[in-house]
Amino acid sequence: MANIKSAKKRIKVTEKKTLRNKMIKSALKTAIKKFEVAVQANNKAEAATLYVEAARALDMSASKGVVHKNMAARKKSRLAAKLNAMA
C-alpha cells in the first residue's frame, strides 16, 4: 500500500482510467461483433449501418488513447474489406 499522498492519488486515478478504458474497449468489441454477425448473415444493409458504428467506436477509442491509431486504422480497413466483399 502506498504511503505517499501523491502515490495514493495515482492509484485512484489509475483505477478510474482502467475502468474507463475497459468500458470503451468492451463497447468497441461489441460493435465489431455485431458487424461480424451481420456479415455472416449476409445482411448488407444492416452490415453497412453497423460498419459505421464500428468505425465510429474505433475512431473514438483511438482518439482517447485506448487503442493505437494504427490498430484502429487496420481494423477499419479489414471491416471495410469484409463489407465490400459482400457485394
Curated annotation (Swiss-Prot):
SUPFAM superfamilies: Ribosomal protein S20 (SSF46992). GO terms for molecular function: small ribosomal subunit rRNA binding; structural constituent of ribosome. Keywords: Ribonucleoprotein, Ribosomal protein, RNA-binding, rRNA-binding. InterPro entries: Ribosomal_bS20, Ribosomal_bS20_sf. One of its GO terms (cellular component) is small ribosomal subunit. The keyword rRNA-binding applies. One of its GO terms (biological process) is translation. PANTHER family: 30S RIBOSOMAL PROTEIN S20, SMALL RIBOSOMAL SUBUNIT PROTEIN BS20C. Belongs to the bacterial ribosomal protein bS20 family. Binds directly to 16S ribosomal RNA. This is Small ribosomal subunit protein bS20. The gene is rpsT.
